[in-house]
Amino acid sequence: MQDVLLQVQAVSKSYHDGDVTTQVLSDVDLQVFKGEQLAIVGTSGSGKSTLLHIMGTLDKPSSGKVLLAGEDLYQVSSARQAQIRNQDLGFIYQFHHLLPEFTALENVAMPAFIQGRDRTLAQADAKVLLERVGLGHRMSHIPAELSGGERQRVAIARALINKPKLVLADEPTGNLDAKSGEAVYELIRELANQLGTAFVVVTHDPKLAARMDRQLTMKNGYLQVPESAQ
């Protein structure tokens, strides 16, 4: 039996603007297992990014629970949430959000610096990760000197620097050409297998999602249950 890492229990999310209520998520239940690679697919506006943000404590559910390793993420202090984000979760976005004035090495090491780790040890770990993603020769380059695919590889290494239990990726290949996008997905799979890190990847591309261990579909705020699970 697989060990459950993250549980989403009856999560709903709505926004209110005066008398108008917009329902974004409706009673979503989901389990993410340790070390698995899960894709969530759906069209724009289906609610998949909102779900990912709630899983990462970047947005709060209107109702329901999210538990990481048994800990209810919305019953802890904001300080504890910040600690969880930095220590137990990694994030990858469509746009890399690298700090432009810092080198690839410094960008990867930054979350470890924020955590208060020894700078020399943090940079040593960052070097190992950059070599692992094929950028050992680009460590001293700033983001403007890197290609789009290289910048996203730096972002993946940064997401892994604190050895998170779970990495949440929101359209990680959405800003890349097809070849670079495929390379990023292969890298995610390779790293997940090597490190035992769980990945949840939100994407609109079913072909890329099919490479993951499991895929689920969001539609109009509902998580579709595969026929095999019904």
From Swiss-Prot:
Q: Where does ATP bind?
A: 42-49
* Disulfide pairings: none
Record membrane topology: Peripheral membrane protein
Q: What Enzyme Commission number(s) appear in the record?
A: 7.6.2.-
Identify the CDD domains for this entry: ABC_MJ0796_LolCDE_FtsE
Does the record carry Repeat as a key word?
Answer: no
**Record's Gene Ontology CC terms?**
plasma membrane
User: Main role?
Assistant: Part of the ABC transporter complex LolCDE involved in the translocation of mature outer membrane-directed lipoproteins, from the inner membrane to the periplasmic chaperone, LolA. Responsible for the formation of the LolA-lipoprotein complex in an ATP-dependent manner.
Task: Supply the name of the protein.
Answer: Lipoprotein-releasing system ATP-binding protein LolD
